[in-house]
């Protein structure tokens, strides 16, 4: 599994994320992608790496990110506003669908706890 830390912007805040690719990925290929969302007051580095490993082993590119104000992302720390988190998810999807490894017509969103609601 290939992994790298990436950043993207959501409404002016820089969000931090992990981007995972399967080891068997072939350049030029476009695969379905998955965005992983952490729960209510979680961070991307707890629990989500296990799920990322599962999805990547199944062949999916995966983006796991911290909402603004959580983990390595900018923003007011630990502030939870559902509308802002929805904007962050939309911007995570936009980032993922722009990656050359990902088929933008085949995307999924998966989350734990409140991240899956």
What spans do the regions from the language model cover?
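N-terminal cap/lid segment of alpha/beta-hydrolase-fold proteins
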Residues: 1-32
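Catalytic nucleophile-loop/oxyanion-hole region of alpha/beta-hydrolase
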Residues: 43-47, 70-104
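Alpha/beta-hydrolase fold nucleophile elbow
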Residues: 101-113
């Amino acid at each position: 599994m290939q992994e790298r830390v990436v950043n993207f912007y959501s409404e002016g805040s820089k969000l931090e994320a992990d981007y995972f690719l399967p080891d068997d990925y072939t350049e030029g290929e476009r695969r379905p992608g998955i965005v992983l969302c952490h729960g209510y007051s979680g961070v991307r580095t707890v629990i989500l790496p296990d799920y990322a490993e599962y999805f990547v082993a199944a062949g999916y590119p995966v983006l796991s990110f911290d909402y603004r104000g959580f983990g390595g992302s900018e923003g007011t720390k630990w502030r939870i506003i559902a509308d802002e988190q929805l904007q962050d998810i939309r911007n995570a999807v936009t980032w993922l669908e722009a990656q050359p490894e990902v088929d933008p017509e085949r995307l999924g969103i998966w989350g734990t706890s409140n991240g899956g609601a």
